[in-house]
Each structure stands twice: as structure tokens, then as C-alpha cells.
From Swiss-Prot:
It comes from Nitrobacter winogradskyi (strain ATCC 25391 / DSM 10237 / CIP 104748 / NCIMB 11846 / Nb-255). One of its GO terms (biological process) is peptide biosynthetic process. Belongs to the elongation factor P family. It is found in: Cytoplasm. This is Elongation factor P. Pathway: Protein biosynthesis; polypeptide chain elongation. Keywords: Cytoplasm, Elongation factor, Protein biosynthesis. One of its GO terms (molecular function) is translation elongation factor activity. CDD domains: S1_EF-P_repeat_1, S1_EF-P_repeat_2. The keyword Cytoplasm applies. Pfam families: EFP, EFP_N, Elong-fact-P_C. HAMAP family: EF_P.
């Protein structure tokens, strides 16, 4: 489907020169003089090469048709990450470069959204929040009230984050998958 360059957003998949690219950043620039342009940074899906393109905001760009499906994470091996479609029981392997920074948050049997182009995975979307256990942090300080200061902690997936002073080792906490920030103590 052809669209104007100014309508391209992060996460869109563009087809250019017979290759697919996932958009990492898209910014519309309106200089004081001259023609407005769309600055688009994207990654080629086939080999992970990043490129940056400038289009006039009125230029036509081919946006690829993408289908989103729910998949269950099964396991990781040397070849990549393996997921199963809950409806059809089809299994698909996703390369490590597509999973990227989402890898530490994947848990067995977690339901994620995979974006597919011609049944080839091009992007992954995790749930917004995930529950993890604190495996390393400073000891709890008695008498310290809840304050806005956080102490460093390491979670069971190896991610470092800040937690409130009352959180101890072994406590299960909810964190945002986007940036690893603490949300709350788990209610389970």
C-alpha cells in the first residue's frame, strides 16, 4: 500500500528496492526555508543493517502489509527464539536481532504479539508489564519510610533497576518491559 512519507511511524514496515525495512524512528522536519522532509531511520529485516533516508513529506512510500498474531514463547536456543501460534499450533523461529532488547523479559509460556509479513516475523511486542524476582539488592533498612529514593537491584532476568527501600531479596516485583522501571510489588 502506497502512503505519503509524512504518515510513516515507528514500527511500520516499508518495502524499498525489493527489501523490507522496519522503521526505528520517523521525524517530520519543517525547516524555515525549503521543503519539509521526513527523516526516517530503519533497519533492513533480512540482515539487520541500519539505514537513514530522507523523503519529501509528499513522496510516496510502499508500506508492507503486516498481520499481528498472538504467539506463546516456548524456548530459546542457539538459532533464535521459538514461538507457537495458540490457534493453529504452528511454530515459528524468530532471529535474535528481531527480538533484540525484549529478550531478557521473555518467560516460558508468555503470550506476545508477533508482526508477520508473508508469515515471516518482522517485529515483536511484549506485554507492558512483567513480574520478576529481585535476586540482588541492598538489605532493608528498618525505620526508613517510603521515599522517592530508590536503591539499585538486579532482577531474575539480569536486568538492573531501581526499587524502593522496603524491597528485599526474593521479593517479586512488577516492572515495565519497555525500560525495566519498577511499577509495584507483585500481588501473588
Amino acid at each position: 500500500m502506497r502512503v505519503i512519507a509524512s504518515s510513516i511511524r515507528k514500527g511500520n514496515v516499508i518495502e524499498q528496492d525489493g527489501k523490507l525495512y522496519v522503521v526505528l524512528t520517523a521525524e517530520n522536519i519543517h525547516p524555515g526555508k525549503g521543503t519539509p522532509v521526513s527523516q526516517i531511520e530503519m533497519r533492513r529485516i533480512s540482515d539487520g543493517v541500519k539505514i537513514s533516508e530522507r523523503y519529501k513529506t509528499t513522496d510516496q512510500v510502499e508500506r508492507a502489509t503486516i498481520e499481528d498474531h498472538n504467539f506463546t514463547f516456548l524456548y530459546e536456543d542457539g538459532d533464535g527464539f521459538h514461538f507457537m501460534n495458540a490457534e493453529t499450533y504452528d511454530q515459528v523461529q524468530v532471529p535474535k536481532d528481531i527480538v533484540g532488547s525484549a529478550a531478557p523479559y521473555l518467560q516460558e509460556n508468555m503470550v506476545v504479539k508477533l508482526s508477520l509479513h508473508d508469515m515471516v516475523p518482522v517485529a515483536i511486542t511484549l506485554p507492558q508489564r512483567v513480574t520478576l524476582e529481585v535476586v540482588e539488592t541492598e538489605p532493608v533498612t528498618k525505620g526508613q519510610t517510603a521515599s522517592s529514593s530508590y536503591k539499585p537491584a538486579v532482577l531474575s532476568n539480569g536486568v538492573r533497576t531501581g526499587v524502593p527501600p522496603h524491597v528485599a531479596v526474593g521479593t517479586r516485583v512488577v516492572v515495565m518491559t519497555e525500560d525495566g522501571s519498577y511499577v509495584e510489588r507483585a500481588k501473588d
